[in-house]
Structures are given as structure tokens and as C-alpha cells.
Amino acid sequence: MRWIVLFASLAVAACATAQQAVPLPPPPATSAPAADTFRFVSDGPAGPGWSRPDEIARKYFHENLTALFERTLTLDAALPQRATLRWIFTGPRAGLTVELTSSRIRIAERYYDSMALYEGQGNFPEKTTFTDERQYTGDARTLTVIADSHLAVRVLINGQQILEAPLLFDLTRHQLMLAASRTAHQIVSGSLVKPNIKDATVTINESQVHQTMLGFGGSPSIAAYAELSDQGKRAYWQILKRYNLLLSREYPMGTELKPDLSNLEDLADATPHYYGDNFPNSELSSFDYSRHVLDLGGSVIYELWALPSWATVPNNGPHATDTWNKPIKRVANPNEYARLIVTYCKKAQAATGSAPAIVGIENEVDQPPEVFSSMALALRRELDKAGFTATKIHMADASFMFLGIDRATELRKNPEAWKTLDYSAVHEYDFQEFLANPDLYDARMNQMHEAADGKPFLATEICINDPHYQEPSYRIALAVAQLYHKNLTELDAVALMFCWLLLDVEQPSFAGSRSLLAPDRTRSWIPVPTSFQLRVMGAFSRHVVKGMQRIGVETGDPDLLATAFADAQNETLVVIIRSTPSRRLDLQGASHAWAEIEHTGLEDENSVAPFRTGNVIQPGEILVLSTIKAQ
């Protein structure tokens, strides 16, 4: 992980280079207009307010910061000796402070969202979690702080980068304070530079036609759904309809399933998915739930995880190991496995009127390649024999894309088995290796696209499960938004699915990182968003409906990510900006008149307004233009 390495390297660097001062370049000429000004007088009147009786009055900048930002201060003169200018950035959970003296620059990050952080001083809990500093020589006349899409914050003096630190949490406001002698007459003044706006052109090319979309969704925890009140269940289906999350990827009963499948809906046989201290919350089906999905025009995807013991046999083939290098002692019995799936399809058809639209071979569990091939062949044969010829099959999806590449490569060695598969599929947990630098994942995605050999691709599980990144911030969600874009444009994904649609947890970080929604026990058991992940997925899902085709679109800007979709009646454009400054968009090539525009960001939760020209997209924002009027 980039930031694990960075923490270690910074610690070493702090010791090795603590005495090496950085020579600054000459102060740059600045002609940018000022958004605001500040003036501190060290021996002037004390600031108003309670609890700081002799503090120099602070300067408060009355703006809300965008998710990504670049802000620059200019100083009218060199900072006096023994004076410290503190630039304080705050957010809902944590903040950072940049301190500038006449010879040193320092950054400190602190959390203040839990009483567990109280260390015995001050009137609120807080704990500093990161610090770094460097000495410099020269005349510091501009100070710049950049919160970028690489999950980092960078500090520049006179345009030269001096410090870089990890930044996972959101920042929303900022202020200045001066710490200086109250008995000396020192003046520190300057201005906050007004952020500029660049022009950008987005050109749609409808002659370039790519994949046809199936939709968006994820896995519901049926145990969590059962916890919802009647009001909560109604709200849940309204949310799924509003966000067009109508692909229901079942996480059905496996190890506890009886041979006749008589207990597949029995809540008493649910198993705990071990996120911390979770109660039993998974491996359960509900035909009532599936009926609701179908009534909304959605589809059910059925895939077993660990098989029941009665559907396995000892591995008498060549020695094989799983992902964790443990020997595979038992493998699937292809015929019994196929019987299980067909029995489920019959029960589903009887209860809901429809068999699953898609069946996956097996979720994450490793089988020798020849066993996966036998499972695919047996499943297709038995589905067809039972009349379920319309039910499609997707390949066994591995946890990581690099394993998915290997699986697809091995499966293609058996052309007959490969032919039975309608979709390629994989989970994308290895994206977290590149969360701070998403473009580095491109090579792996291109390899998967090649290995899929033209089969439509399903992104079957996307979420954050690395404990280093379980911060429920918009900044983390924005990194996942880039992954959605890359799936659509590099893998030609026809479906995007978050890990869980609904999940009940004990430790809250598992909710914000794993699930879009969770039951709120404090509000009559209604479903509520766990983080910014719901709105970010909604930026794609709400205006891209089943049957739309992805079409070509160009921006000429590597930090302006655009995807476009169209069918005979409608058109949708999704634009992500992952850098500063803001862009004023000139939209070209659309053949339909836009009906509405939707803003998604740190402040905007899929906020819809009538279309207008001259749209400006703010750093870190997702802008959607569509002919479809979403709910």
C-alpha cells in the first residue's frame, strides 16, 4: 500500500534529513485576484469570543471547501522571527493544520470524533495521528495546500513542494491564526488567492458503440432486511428504485443447506459473516425479496459460495492449492452441484414466477481448473434439460482480478466448457493496492479484458475491505468512482455491483466500507446510507438504465473522466473531475436535448436541477447530464 510505505519512508526521512534545510525558489510573481484578505497585528486587540482571553483574532474564510482543492496564501512580507502562522483545516471527523514560521514548515493531522481520543488535556477529545516538518531557507511568500485525488495532501512554499502526507478524511472549512508575541508590534498580512476555472470540451461520439448495459446492484443481507420495520422495508424499496439498484446478487445458503433445500429461507440457519462481532447476517435466500426485485423490473443473480459438504467429494486429482496456498482437500461434485442449482431454479420459478437471470459457478472458492470446467458443463446441461435455457451462466469469480485473469486463461483451455459461459466476472479487491493511484490498475484490467476473450464482463463485488482505508469519507468514495469509470471504459462492464446493498454490523467501519445501506436501530429500523458510497454509485446507476449502450466520448483531459450512454430515446453523460481547478464544460455531440443535470459530491447527494448551459464542475465532483428524469 502506498501510504504504508509512505509512513515508513517519512519516518526514516524525518530522522535522516531533519537538519537538511530546503532552499526555496524566489517568491513567484502573483497576479491572480484575491478571494479574501487577512491582517494580523500581534499587539492589537484580543479576538472576540469565549475561552481564548488573549489570542490574536483569527481569520475565518467563509467558504465551503470542495472535495479536492488547491488553496494559496500570499504574504505581503516575510514572516517575522518567532511568529507562527497556522492554517487550520477542519472536517466532520478530523482536521489538519499547516504551520509556517520564518524557517520551518510543519503539518499535523488529528482526529476528534471519539471520546476514546481524549488524552487528558483540552476541552474536547482529539489525537494527533500524523506529523511531519521540514526546515527551509529563503523568503516564504506563498503557501499552497493541495488536497488531491491521490488520497494525499501536499504543501508548497513559493510553488515548490516541501511536504506530502496521506489524507483519507474530508475537509470542509479553513481558518488562519497567528501565534506571536503580544508585547511586540508585528504585522502579518496577505490574501487568499481566488481559485481559477479552466475551460474544457466534452465531445460525444455516438458512432462509437460499445457494451449494452444490464444494470447495477449488489448483495442484500436477508437477515438485515428482516430487521427492517414495515416503514423501513417500504423505504428500502424506494431507495433501490430511486437508485436503480435492481440487480440482486443473492448470497445464498451454502454450508448449512440441506440436500432437499428445505431450509434455504430459514433465518435460524443464517451464518455470521465475520466482520468484527457481527451477528448471523448472511447465506440466506428469500423468495419474497426476489419477488419485490422482479416487480421493480430487476433481475436475480444466484451464486453459491462454500458448497454444502454433501455437494463435494475428496480431491483425488493432482495436488492443488487455494489462493492462500492451502491444499484443496475437497472439491465440488459437478453433478450434485448442478442438481442443487436446478432445484433452486425450480423453487424460485414456483415462488416468484422466474428462475434467476444469471447463475454464477461459485463465489471466490478455489477449485482446480478441471473441476470448474466440469461444473460449467454439468450446470449448462442440467439447466437446459430442466427447461431453464434462458438462464445465463457467469464464470467463477475470484476475489482479485489477477486471479480472475488466471481463471479465465485456464478455463479457455477447455473450449467446450468456456463456450457454456455467457459472462466473465471477477471481484476487484486488489484495486485497493492502487487506491491512491487508480491508473496503475489499468494494466491489470486490460489483461482481464483480453483474458475474457469477448465475453461480457460483470464486476460482481466492489467495496473497500482493507482496514487502512475504512474511512467513510467522500475522498475514498471518489477513488471507487474512478474504478466504476474504468470498469465501464476498459473492461466494457455490463454490470457494476457493490459488495452489499444492505448489511447490519456492530463495528461501524464495516458498514461504511462494505455496504451501501444499513438498518438504523435508532430511527425505527429504517435503512440509511452508511457513507458516500451510495451517492457515488447513484451518479452512475440513476441515469443509466438496462439496455442502454455505452457510446464514445472524449475530453482531451486525463483528469476529466467521462462515460456516455444512449438508446433510441435517451442519452446520459457522466463526468468525474479528479483534479483542480474547476472546469467550465462545453458539451458537444449530443443528439438529444438534456432534461436535467445532477450534482454528486461532498455536499450534494445526487442533487437534480433542470439543465442549463455553462455548467461548472467542481474538483472531486461527479456531474451527470441526462434526458432521463430520475426520481
How should each PLM-predicted stretch be described?
Residues 554-591, 621:
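Carbohydrate-binding surface patches
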Residues 197-357, 361, 370-377, 381:
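N-terminal catalytic cores of secreted or lumenal carbohydrate-active enzymes
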